[in-house]
Curated annotation (Swiss-Prot):
Entry protein name: Putative dihydroorotate dehydrogenase A (fumarate)
Pathway stated in the Swiss-Prot or TrEMBL entry: Pyrimidine metabolism; UMP biosynthesis via de novo pathway
HAMAP family membership: DHO_dh_type1
Keyword Chaperone set for record: no
GO molecular function terms attached to this record: dihydroorotate dehydrogenase (fumarate) activity
Subcellular location: Cytoplasm
Length: 306
């Protein structure tokens, strides 16, 4: 009798019924946004990053399409963690999938206070944004320093009861930073974020983004993200959420084979639509059945056997 392959999986202390969700940054904190992910076929919702104080973000324009992807610099616009936590409390109450908060701080004390408040709001986990490519004094600048990563992760993980996930960007010190994050108490990793990029309008003769420099996301960074996941998993066997250019089931399967247990969809959620999540889930299930695997877990890290 035909039995569908099992897609549910445990990752970073969470149990996901479907191993695909949205990446932080493309949606906010409200219940209606989590419903977009649920109705689109996703298995978890990641909220937009919040900061200690409210931020207006960078001047417009924030987004610019490029071949296969998007260059963006929103500037972490958000109402501050206190206001966001109120919205997330309502989202948690209404959602039937895990809700993951995302925070971007400065001093360790800020990270701890934000994370503690969001834990009280009922979120399932907290993702530490240590990789925003255009957040001066934090983000990628912080995430490239393994000692600084360990300091922030340790401060937060030692305070919370819920899982802490470190989101790291690509750098020459990624494997070291990932190892330090795990040693400091991170239950899982998100790899990677968008990559520093710029687009210039040749007729206006100036950068197209209000902030001039932004982050490139979408298909162009997918091979880089696959390499990042492969290298980090090879060294750490960590629980990994993979992000970077996922728009098809094949992209997702690449990440699973490299070592990821779940994938986050960003640019394609915007360019294709929320239904891309269901398309990926169904494609992955079909792939497992055709290839003779009983579960998603069976292919996690399989490429390392080659």
């Amino acid at each position: 009798m035909y039995s569908q392959p099992e897609l549910s999986i445990s990752i970073a202390g969470l149990r996901l019924q479907r191993p695909v969700g949205n990446a932080s940054g493309i949606l906010g904190w409200e219940p209606r946004e989590a419903r977009l992910v649920e109705e689109g076929g996703g298995g978890f919702f990641v909220a937009k990053s919040v900061t200690y104080q409210p931020r207006k973000g960078y001047p417009q324009p924030h987004l610019y399409p490029v071949a296969g992807g998007i260059v963006n610099a929103v500037g972490l616009a958000n109402p501050g963690f206190r206001e966001a936590s109120k919205m997330l409390a309502q989202t948690v109450e209404e959602a039937s999938i895990p809700v993951i908060a995302s925070i971007a701080g400065g001093a360790p004390g800020e990270w701890v206070e934000m994370a503690s408040t969001l834990e009280e709001a009922g979120v399932s986990a907290v993702e530490l944004n240590l990789s925003c490519p255009h957040f001066a004094g934090g983000g990628l600048e912080l995430g490239q320093d393994p000692a600084a990563v360990a300091s922030v992760v340790s401060a937060v993980a030692s305070t919370l009861r819920i899982p802490v996930i470190a989101k790291l960007g690509y750098s020459d010190r990624l494997v070291d930073a990932a190892s330090k994050a795990l040693e400091a108490g991170a239950r899982g990793l998100t790899l990677i974020n968008s990559m520093r990029a710029m687009k210039i309008d040749v007729y206006a003769k100036k950068p197209v983004l209000g902030n001039r420099v932004g982050g490139l996301s979408g298909k162009p960074i997918h091979p880089i993200a696959v390499r990042a996941v492969y290298e980090v998993y090879g060294e750490t066997r960590a629980d990994i959420f993979a992000a970077g250019g996922v728009e098809s089931w094949e992209d997702a399967v690449e990440f699973y084979l490299a070592g990821a247990k779940a994938v986050q969809v960003g640019a394609a959620f915007i360019t294709i639509g929320p239904h891309v999540l269901r398309s990926i889930v169904e494609g992955v299930r079909r792939y497992l059945w055709v290839e003779g695997f009983r579960s998603l877990q069976d292919i996690v890290g399989y490429a390392h056997r080659a």
